[in-house]
Amino acid sequence: METIWIYQFRLIVIGDSTVGKSCLLHRFTQGRFPGLHSPACDPTVGVDFFSRLLEIEPGKRIKLQLWDTAGQERFRSITRSYYRNSVGGFLVFDITNRRSFEHVKDWLEEAKMHVQPFQIVFLLVGHKCDLASQRQVSREEAERLSTDCGMKYIETSAKDATNVEESFTILTRDIYELIKKGEICIQDGWEGVKSGFVPNTVHSSEEAVKPRKECFC
């Protein structure tokens, strides 16, 4: 029997090269850390695709399409084309790499420039928190930046699985709540949110899972 999911969200993962975006996605979708010398942790060339179902409430599942983007400048033109069709994103930096943190605002501004006229919800992720002794960015500083930029902040480690599941759950639930409030709408021609496979009997919160030709969110 086909798995029931009420929505499909397309999420993009952005940030500098080597901050661990691919390792985070492997941990979340496959439940394992591929290892520092695994090809899975090599810098992404262009864009890679991952997928997983996430249950946000009992009996309510969201299908996540996850796009892992290259951090290198030569692939940025490819990355930019994926912003517009994403409803959410993880903006990842390495807590042991000060420069990756300093580039957070650049990534955010680039995303905002290319997402118009749609809305994208971001979560700021401080990765590699298992390397706390090598930290170059304090939690307090990262939290200040996230507040200034209107994002939530979480620290994760793909190596020991710290907060990996939680980070994807937080962003997925935030988007789901905005849909229920009518602040994010399903629209024809936009891939960010799609209605899913639901039973004939739907709950009131799911009755709005219908595409709209116009949205004034």
Curated annotation (Swiss-Prot):
UniProt: GTP binding residues: S17, G20, K21, S22, C23, T44, G71, H127, K128, D130, A158, K159
The biological process GO terms on file are: autophagosome-lysosome fusion; phagosome acidification; phagosome-lysosome fusion; protein transport; Rab protein signal transduction
- How would you summarize its activity regulation? Regulated by guanine nucleotide exchange factors (GEFs) including c9Orf72, which promote the exchange of bound GDP for free GTP. Regulated by GTPase activating proteins (GAPs) which increase the GTP hydrolysis activity. Inhibited by GDP dissociation inhibitors (GDIs).
Picking any one GO molecular function of the record gives: G protein activity
**Record note on modification:** Prenylated. Prenylation is required for association with cellular membranes.
A GO cellular component annotation in the UniProt record: phagocytic vesicle
Instruction: List residues modified as Cysteine methyl ester.
Output: C217
- Main subcellular localisation: membrane
Q: Which Gene3D superfamilies match?
A: P-loop containing nucleotide triphosphate hydrolases (3.40.50.300)
Under catalytic activity, the entry for this protein gives: GTP + H2O = GDP + phosphate + H(+)
**Switch-II: region residues:** 71-87
Record's domain comment?
Switch I, switch II and the interswitch regions are characteristic of Rab GTPases and mediate the interactions with Rab downstream effectors. The switch regions undergo conformational changes upon nucleotide binding which drive interaction with specific sets of effector proteins, with most effectors only binding to GTP-bound Rab.
Protein purpose: The small GTPases Rab are key regulators of intracellular membrane trafficking, from the formation of transport vesicles to their fusion with membranes. Rabs cycle between an inactive GDP-bound form and an active GTP-bound form that is able to recruit to membranes different sets of downstream effectors directly responsible for vesicle formation, movement, tethering and fusion.
User: Which protein is depicted?
Assistant: Ras-related protein Rab-39A
The taxonomic lineage of its organism, from the top, reads: Eukaryota, Metazoa, Chordata, Craniata, Vertebrata
